[in-house]
């Protein structure tokens, strides 16, 4: 009497890979390690008839629940780690409850190893809250990604929100929500963002006497109140005073164990992060040398939620033409505060030449993009080596917060106007004109 062979699993890797490609937000963006690949093979993403498990072993039910809990998550969004860890703990608990029935089952043991590997990768604690196995009926009103982060489009499809990035650093250099890059004067107080959810204002002061170049020495951020989530919170930083708390002395907003708004001090007096779950927004503030830098990621639908009277927002519309340094006209005069013809040789800041400035910037930024050009520009116009670190940190913030990797680097190619071009192409011209 012959023994009937079990159904073949030879197609499992292809099936698992195809399913993974249809779920871009399920796993972290880094390449999966071998254990994670093994988990993918065991996830129960296969058709019911491909690899039958004994009826008493419920590993496929555990896996199906885990997929349902994580399919809507966006790895680039605030709160991803917390929600992913909750789902992993729920998955681990489910496997423990079915462990006796699954003893000796390869799929079960692969899943257990994969869960352990993922929990280690994401720094998940074994103890803590777990996700509900009915995620469709659980909504956190103070988590943007729970109540508003997934939008319905035509045909009933759901897509994650579109994020925007804005950054300000150096003399100052502005990267707008549209990825336009500008070098501006904007001396005094100016609004970067002023919408229905968030207000950000910076104050800029002259860097070098007699020059139009300025840099930021004060940042004020207002997280506006939202019912049930947080009271209004104000954060203010000035040179040599970068607090790890709001002006009222608190470090968070909202009730419960998971705060809807909180501050994380990354480097004492030098670098803080603010995470606002209720509006899906992240803000980085740094001090490098005597000046501050700022980087912000915010959902597009919230960033564009403002009244007509709030249209003066540098992150939205860029600097006014009158405030642009790289305006394509009289650039040397704009930078150095002198009235010089373009044929006159203009000296850079003592101690720096184009070659030495380029060498110093290249050590931090091997890619000669607009951040490298900004670094060279700042060294030549101020002589302050701290601006090298500012440009490098600004690029790191882009890589941490900007949602589209292909747009991290911006490359100047020709001279042109501040408002008309998507990037500060005039910056290259400014550097070259100084050495004509």
From Swiss-Prot:
* Residues carrying a glycan: 123, 386
Q: How is it modified after translation?
A: GPI-anchored. Autocatalytically cleaved at low pH; the two chains remain linked via two disulfide bonds.
**Major site of localization recorded for this protein:** membrane
Q: In which tissues is it expressed?
A: Detected in neonatal and adult dorsal root ganglion sensory neurons, spinal cord, and brain (at protein level). Also expressed at high levels in retinal ganglion cells of developing mouse, extending to the optic nerve (at protein level). Expressed in testis, epididymis, ovary, uterus, and pituitary.
Residues the record annotates as the site (Cleavage) are 171-172
Q: Which residues form the propeptide?
A: 416-436
Domain of life the protein comes from: Eukaryota
* Sites of GPI-anchor amidated cysteine lipidation: 415
Signal peptide span = 1-48
Q: How does it sit in the membrane?
A: Lipid-anchor; GPI-anchor
Keyword annotations of the record: Autocatalytic cleavage, Cell membrane, Disulfide bond, Glycoprotein, GPI-anchor, Lipoprotein, Membrane, Signal
Q: What does this protein do?
A: Member of the repulsive guidance molecule (RGM) family that contributes to the patterning of the developing nervous system. Acts as a bone morphogenetic protein (BMP) coreceptor that potentiates BMP signaling. Promotes neuronal adhesion. May inhibit neurite outgrowth.
One Gene Ontology BP term is:
signal transduction
Q: Which PANTHER family does UniProt cross-reference here?
A: REPULSIVE GUIDANCE MOLECULE B, RGM DOMAIN FAMILY MEMBER DRAG-1
Q: Which GO terms describe its cellular component?
A: endoplasmic reticulum-Golgi intermediate compartment; membrane raft; plasma membrane; side of membrane
This protein's record includes keyword Membrane: yes
The similarity annotation says:
Belongs to the repulsive guidance molecule (RGM) family.
Annotated disulfide bonds: 142-229, 166-315
Question: Where can this protein be found?
Answer: Cell membrane; Membrane raft
How does it associate, per the subunit comment?
Answer: Homooligomer. Interacts with DRGX. Interacts with BMP2 and BMP4. Interacts with the BMP type I receptors ACVR1, BMPR1A and BMPR1B and with the BMP type II receptor ACVR2B. The functional complex with its receptor NEO1/neogenin appears to be a heterotetramer with a 2:2 stoichiometry, RGM molecules acting as staples that bring two NEO1 receptors together without interacting themselves, this arrangement leads to activation of downstream signaling via RhoA.
Write down what this protein is called.
Answer: Repulsive guidance molecule B
């Amino acid at each position: 009497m012959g023994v009937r062979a079990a159904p073949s699993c030879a197609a499992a890797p292809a099936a698992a890979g195809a399913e993974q490609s249809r779920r871009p937000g399920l796993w972290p963006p880094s390449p999966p390690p071998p254990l994670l690949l093994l988990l993918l093979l065991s996830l129960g993403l296969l058709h019911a008839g491909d690899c039958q498990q004994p009826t008493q072993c419920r590993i496929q039910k555990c896996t199906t629940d885990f997929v349902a809990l994580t399919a809507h998550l966006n790895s680039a969004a605030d709160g991803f780690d917390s929600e992913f860890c909750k789902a992993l703990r729920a998955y681990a608990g489910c496997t423990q409850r079915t462990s006796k029935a699954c003893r000796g089952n390869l799929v079960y043991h692969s899943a257990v190893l994969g869960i352990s590997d993922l929990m280690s990768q994401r720094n998940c604690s074994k103890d803590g809250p777990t996700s509900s196995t009915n995620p469709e009926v659980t909504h956190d009103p103070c988590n943007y990604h729970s109540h508003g982060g997934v939008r319905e489009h035509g045909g009933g499809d759901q897509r994650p929100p579109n994020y925007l990035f804005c950054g300000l650093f150096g003399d100052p250099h502005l990267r707008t929500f549209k990825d336009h890059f500008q070098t501006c004067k904007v001396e005094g107080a100016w609004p970067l963002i002023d919408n229905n959810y968030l207000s950000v204002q910076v104050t800029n002061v002259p860097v070098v006497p007699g020059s139009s170049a300025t840099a930021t020495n004060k940042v004020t951020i207002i997280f506006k109140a939202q019912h049930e989530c947080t009271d209004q919170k104000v954060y203010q930083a000035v040179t040599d005073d970068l607090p790890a708390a709001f002006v009222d002395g608190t470090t968070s907003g909202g009730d419960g164990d998971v705060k809807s708004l909180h501050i994380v001090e990354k480097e004492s007096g030098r670098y803080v992060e603010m995470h606002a779950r209720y509006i899906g927004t992240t803000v980085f503030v740094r001090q490098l040398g005597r000046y501050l830098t700022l980087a912000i990621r915010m959902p597009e639908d919230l960033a564009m939620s403002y009244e007509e009277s709030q249209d003066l927002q540098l992150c939205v519309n860029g600097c006014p033409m009158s405030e642009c340094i790289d305006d394509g006209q009289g650039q040397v005069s704009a930078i150095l505060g002198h009235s010089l013809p373009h044929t006159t040789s203009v000296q850079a800041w003592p101690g720096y030449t184009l070659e030495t400035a380029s060498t110093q910037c290249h050590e931090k930024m091997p890619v000669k993009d607009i951040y490298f050009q900004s670094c060279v520009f700042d060294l030549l116009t101020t002589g302050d080596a701290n601006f090298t670190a500012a440009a490098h940190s600004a690029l790191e913030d882009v890589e941490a917060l900007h949602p589209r990797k292909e747009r991290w680097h911006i490359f100047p190619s020709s001279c042109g106007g501040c408002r008309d071009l998507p990037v500060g192409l005039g910056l290259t011209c400014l550097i070259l004109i100084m050495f004509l």
